UniProtKB/Swiss-Prot annotation:
Descriptive protein name: Beta-1,4-galactosyltransferase 7
Disulphides: 255-310, 300-308
Coiled coil spans: none
Gene for this chain: beta4GalT7
Bound cofactor: record note: Binds 1 manganese ion per subunit.
Pathway linked to the protein: Protein modification; protein glycosylation
Family: Belongs to the glycosyltransferase 7 family.
Originating species: Drosophila melanogaster (Fruit fly)
Gene null: resulting phenotype: RNAi-mediated knockdown is lethal. RNAi-mediated knockdown in imaginal disks causes a reduction in the wing size and a distal truncation of the legs. Also, synthesis of heparan sulfate and chondroitin sulfate is reduced in the posterior region of late third instar wing imaginal disk.
Residue spans crossing the bilayer: 10-30
Enzyme class, UniProt record, top EC level: transferase
Catalytic function, reaction form: 3-O-(beta-D-xylosyl)-L-seryl-[protein] + UDP-alpha-D-galactose = 3-O-(beta-D-galactosyl-(1->4)-beta-D-xylosyl)-L-seryl-[protein] + UDP + H(+)
Gene3D superfamilies registered for this protein in UniProt: Spore Coat Polysaccharide Biosynthesis Protein SpsA, Chain A (3.90.550.10)
Topology versus the membrane: Single-pass type II membrane protein
GO molecular function: metal ion binding; nucleotide binding; xylosylprotein 4-beta-galactosyltransferase activity
Length: 322
């Protein structure tokens, strides 16, 4: 297991070497189970030379990570973090969320859903994959942006009611989005409800709108969105939004017939037909916190959703990775 501490003077580019997007540092050599030594300039910074390593496991052999049991909770939450090239944010996210959830006694485990193909980012499909991976052990999920950190301890990450999903980052609290049907940022969903809605649409490549389509799924399933009550903080002090729009530019490009198709309710795709391959499962420590990273290769049918690859080059590049 790799022990990653927050080292501000080292720039680490997101999971590029063995993780397909995160450069990994370990301050001491690991045992014989470790593979993939990194022979690169970062190894010298780590002081470990060839001992800079990560543990890689075949998905078929992977045992489900057990949650951190911080209390008497009978429920277990899988914290699903869709991810690509956000390692600096992840180094803040993991210790912050662990301390936050520990104060609430929430049994949980963090799963980083790392998209390593060359298609455009697909947050919804990654969540579908993460749910399939974790749902045997965990009875509810948190769909959680890596750049949104809760500050108010009254935001309870509790097991959602039978009414429907619990939206932690509601429009009256989120620092940026304030429309009534907004369900993005942080949404907690029961296992049975996510299955009932057939998860999320797989058609949303690039940034935005997948949450709006998911709101329609919630409504069509006869469920309701609930939100925390009696929160005294507001849009400026409930969350820390660590997204830098200049450093982390969003992929808002629209190509082919994407704009038209992604404004419709998707009745064809979801949890039951997301196409992917988990290339590797990595168990890591970030500030002594166990984290599971799934290297996920998503598949795209360019005949049905050509906007997954506006450049026309991603399909060939992804084929090389398989």
């Amino acid at each position: 297991m790799v022990n990653i501490s927050t080292i501000n003077w080292v720039f680490v580019c997101g999971l590029s070497f063995c993780l397909g997007g995160i450069a990994v540092l370990s301050l001491m050599p690991l045992g014989s189970d470790c593979v993939c030594p990194l022979s690169n300039p970062l190894a010298k910074l780590a002081g470990g030379g060839e001992g800079v390593s990560v543990i890689k496991k075949e998905p078929a052999d992977e045992k489900q990570p057990q949650p951190h049991d911080h209390g008497a909770s009978v429920h277990k939450m899988a914290l699903l973090v869709p991810f690509r090239d956000r390692f600096e944010e992840l180094l803040q996210f993991v210790p912050h969320m662990t301390a936050f959830l520990k104060r609430q006694g929430v049994a949980h485990h963090i799963f980083v859903l790392n998209q390593v193909d060359r298609f455009r980012f697909n947050r919804a499909s990654l969540i579908n994959v993460g749910f399939q991976f974790a749902s045997d052990v965990y009875d509810y999920i948190a769909m959680h942006d890596v750049d949104l950190l809760p500050l108010n301890d009254n935001l309870l990450y509790e097991y959602p009611s039978s009414l429907g999903p619990l939206h932690i980052a509601g429009p009256k609290l989120h620092p940026k989005y304030h429309y009534d049907n907004f369900v993005g940022g942080i949404l907690l969903v029961r296992r049975e409800h996510f299955k009932q809605m057939n998860g999320m649409s797989n058609q949303y490549w690039g940034w935005g709108l997948e949450d709006d389509e998911f709101f329609v799924r919630i409504r069509d399933a006869g469920l309701q969105v609930t939100r925390p009550q009696n929160i005294k903080t507001g849009t400026n002090d409930t969350f820390s939004h660590i997204h830098n729009r200049y450093h982390r530019k969003r992929d808002t490009q629209k190509c082919f017939n994407q704009k038209e198709m992604t404004r419709k309710r998707d009745h064809k795709t979801g949890l039951d037909n997301v196409k992917y391959k988990i290339l590797k499962v990595h168990e890591m420590l970030i500030d002594q916190v166990p984290v599971t990273i799934l290297n996920i290769l998503l598949d795209c049918d360019v005949n049905k959703t050509p906007w997954c690859d506006c450049s026309g080059t991603a399909a060939a590049a992804s084929a090389v990775q398989t």
